[in-house]
């Protein structure tokens, strides 16, 4: 059975520079190698002396073959934002979007996930951490593809979300920025979706094993794949889904402390948890101020250098 493929939007611009260290082929069988440049001209793609509506380049069936893209922006809107040359496996597709060109990587889901867990966290992390990340990332991705295939779109109703018992935003404008904004590819390559940097960041045997060992595994709730959006650090508290993303309530994504109370912990969990402290009412200014200015116990509040080196 052929492995499912997805499309990942990598970069956009008036010009896109790319290269093929080894030969790629176009749909008509033309072999292409070396440095290339595609330019936007009057709603067309200008490449190799001709105009096109769309370009696609397929790799030869050789293990390890890749293409390179110049000036890929990583860390968009973060203090460490920068451009770099990145390498990708799979096919390269170039389309016209508005008055720019967009480079899209066509890649298998499992190869995509190997890159994601190597880009989002250290590829040298322990196997169990990488396996957990693989399951979460696969769940988020497949849930997103399922939603789009069913042509489901959330109707955003800010007033309804503001009426959540955990929200005081009754008179403020609420706006969600979601991955559904992408119309010509499945996901983007930055933190807006999941960080994906192709094979630029070296994967490791344990990253490959983590994806392989969990192949097909996803998080489920009442027979449906979970929308498993994740963050690297939660500040000790998890917000309700509808207050951050779409005006949809998910019972499995609720506001609570990033902590297991001792009374509910297993024997092994009790060894890593402190006193059973519940999440305070952060809608109260005094409680929120105390929470922000102190360092409350939380899973992501750790000084363990071994753990910190892996995430």
PLM region spans:
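Conserved, single-site charged/polar hotspot
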Residues: 1-311
């Amino acid at each position: 059975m052929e492995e499912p493929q997805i499309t990942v939007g990598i970069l956009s611009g008036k010009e896109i520079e790319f290269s093929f260290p080894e030969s790629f082929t176009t749909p008509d069988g033309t072999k292409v190698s070396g440095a290339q440049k595609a330019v936007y001209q009057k709603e067309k793609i200008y490449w190799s002396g001709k105009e096109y509506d769309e370009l696609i380049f397929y790799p030869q069936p050789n293990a390890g073959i890749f293409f390179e893209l110049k000036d890929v922006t990583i860390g968009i809107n973060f203090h460490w934002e920068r451009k770099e040359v990145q390498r990708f496996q799979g096919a390269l597709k170039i389309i016209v979007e508005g008055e720019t060109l967009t480079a899209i990587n066509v890649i298998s889901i499992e190869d995509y996930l190997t890159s994601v867990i190597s880009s989002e966290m250290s590829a040298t992390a322990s196997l169990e951490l990488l396996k957990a990340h693989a399951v979460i990332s696969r769940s988020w991705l497949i849930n997103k593809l399922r939603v789009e295939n069913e042509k489901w779109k959330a109707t955003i109703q800010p007033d309804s979300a503001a009426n959540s018992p955990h929200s005081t935003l009754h008179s403020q404008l609420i706006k969600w920025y979601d991955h559904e904004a992408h119309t010509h590819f499945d996901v983007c390559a930055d933190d807006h979706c999941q960080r994906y940097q192709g094979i630029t960041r070296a994967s490791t045997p344990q990253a490959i094993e983590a994806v392989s060992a969990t192949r097909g595994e996803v998080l489920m709730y009442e027979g449906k794949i979970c929308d498993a959006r994740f963050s690297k650090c939660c500040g000790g508290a998890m917000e309700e889904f509808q207050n951050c993303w779409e005006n949809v309530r998910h019972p499995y994504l609720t506001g609570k402390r990033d902590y297991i109370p001792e009374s509910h912990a297993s024997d092994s969990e009790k060894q890593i948890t402190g006193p059973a402290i519940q999440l305070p009412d952060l809608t109260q200014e005094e409680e929120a101020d105390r929470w922000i200015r102190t360092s409350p116990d939380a899973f992501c509040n750790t000084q363990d250098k071994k753990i910190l080196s892996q995430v």
